[in-house]
């Protein structure tokens, strides 16, 4: 499957600004379903398929939405469990976060999860160790490094095209 559209499937409160607004409080008003429905309608009207990088937290809160995305032929990939920045996690925390997310998705949709995107593209030079963990967990590709540098993420010298792409 070759998709040119990707959607980070998270809610408004998962944004990362310095310490962020992040919360895993299920009592916060969610807008993710309404927004994803808009994308699905647009993609359907234009016969487009996309990759949806979904948080494990969103899988738990909106399982029917995730099933609908998959049923419409879109790829479901991991965005981690709780939208924690990779470079703020230990190796152990990162492994547990991604393992949990991958398992939740695979159990729900019955398909192997091949891809991963770090929250806020937070694999930076200091957290390249995460790539080894992703490989150990069976991921075939990642979309987790942004080839520029800003206040939150990026590796300016990173390749701007697929590197050793096999999927």
Over which residues does each language-model region extend?
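Short, electropositive alpha-helical surface patch
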Residues: 59-76, 128-140
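Histidine-centered catalytic micro-motifs
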Residues: 76-83
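Alpha-helical scaffold elements lining the catalytic groove of polysaccharide deacetylases
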Residues: 33, 85-107, 166
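Active-site beta->alpha N-cap acidic-glycine motif
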Residues: 1-72, 117
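Hydrophobic residues in well-ordered beta-strands that form the structural core
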Residues: 52, 78, 141-143
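Short catalytic/ligand-binding loop motif for oxyanion handling, primarily in non-cytosolic enzymes
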Residues: 13-15, 60-62, 84-87, 123-127, ...
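Phosphate/nucleotide-binding catalytic core
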Residues: 55, 101, 105, 117-119
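Active-site-adjacent pocket scaffolds in enzyme catalytic domains
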Residues: 107, 111-112, 118-167
């Amino acid at each position: 499957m070759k998709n040119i559209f990707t959607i980070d499937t998270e809610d408004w409160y998962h944004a990362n600004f310095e310490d962020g607004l992040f919360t895993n409080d299920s009592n916060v008003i969610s807008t993710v379903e309404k927004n994803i429905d808009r994308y699905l309608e647009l993609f359907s009207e234009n016969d487009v398929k996309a990759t949806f990088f979904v948080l494990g937290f969103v899988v738990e809160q909106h399982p029917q939405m995730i099933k609908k995305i998959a049923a419409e032929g879109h790829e479901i990939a991991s965005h981690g469990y709780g939208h924690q920045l990779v470079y703020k996690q230990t190796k152990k925390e990162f492994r547990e976060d991604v393992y949990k997310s991958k398992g939740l998705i695979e159990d729900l949709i019955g398909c192997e999860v091949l891809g991963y995107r770090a929250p806020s593209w937070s694999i930076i030079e200091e957290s390249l160790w995460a790539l080894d963990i992703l490989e150990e967990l069976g991921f075939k590709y990642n979309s987790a490094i942004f080839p520029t540098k800003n206040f939150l993420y990026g590796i300016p010298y990173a390749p701007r095209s697929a590197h050793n792409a096999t999927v």
